[in-house]
Amino acid sequence: MNAKRAIPVRERNIVLIGFMGVGKTTIGQLVAKKLYRDFIDIDQQIEKDFNMSIPEIFEKKGEDFFRKTEKEYILDICHHKRFKIVSLGGGSFKQEEIRNCCLENCLVLHLDLSWENWKQRADLLIESRPVLHNRSMDEMEQLFNERKVIYDKHNSKVATDNLSPEEVADYIVETLKIGWDLYQPM
């Protein structure tokens, strides 16, 4: 039996993907509160468990260590937890195993923000995002566009331009509830 069918749609974790700084954590917390679900931010969980910031982990243990740890956390949540709202780090969905597991076992929502709106936030993000360190705006745009191709593998896309986090969260919750009401298990 397909693993996706084994998990009832209402019980599936909701996974938020998108480029760094699009609002996955803020929106995820709001959605979790509105749906009475637990919220898990993968990056925050790793920081807590290792008692280091992501930039420190990159510096002291390396990106490969971080990506391996990130994968372990995400696969565990996908396979062993239900009813969660999960925010993935901006680069985690690049890993095929993570992508496939999330798409098979969860509902994956792509929070989509235009480059024009994202670059207005760039100065606030660079210090806390090691992947952005020492990159020009052109290099950041290239990374943004490369990742967008990966984020196109999702169950649903939510355009977030010119919307507040509260408005995005309300839209997600309303859409999920409609989908859950329409879904009839076979």
Curated annotation (Swiss-Prot):
PROSITE patterns: SHIKIMATE_KINASE (PS01128)
GO MF annotation terms: ATP binding; magnesium ion binding; shikimate kinase activity
Catalytic activity, EC: 2.7.1.71
This protein's UniProt keywords: Amino-acid biosynthesis, Aromatic amino acid biosynthesis, ATP-binding, Cytoplasm, Kinase, Magnesium, Metal-binding, Nucleotide-binding, Transferase
Cofactor note: Binds 1 Mg(2+) ion per subunit.
Binding site for substrate: 43, 67, 90, 147
Catalytic reaction list: shikimate + ATP = 3-phosphoshikimate + ADP + H(+)
CC per GO annotation: cytosol
Single GO BP term: amino acid biosynthetic process
Pathway: Metabolic intermediate biosynthesis; chorismate biosynthesis; chorismate from D-erythrose 4-phosphate and phosphoenolpyruvate: step 5/7
Localization, UniProt: Cytoplasm
Function: Catalyzes the specific phosphorylation of the 3-hydroxyl group of shikimic acid using ATP as a cosubstrate.
Family: Belongs to the shikimate kinase family.
Protein name (record): Shikimate kinase
The species this protein was found in: Bacillus subtilis (strain 168)
Gene (UniProt): aroK
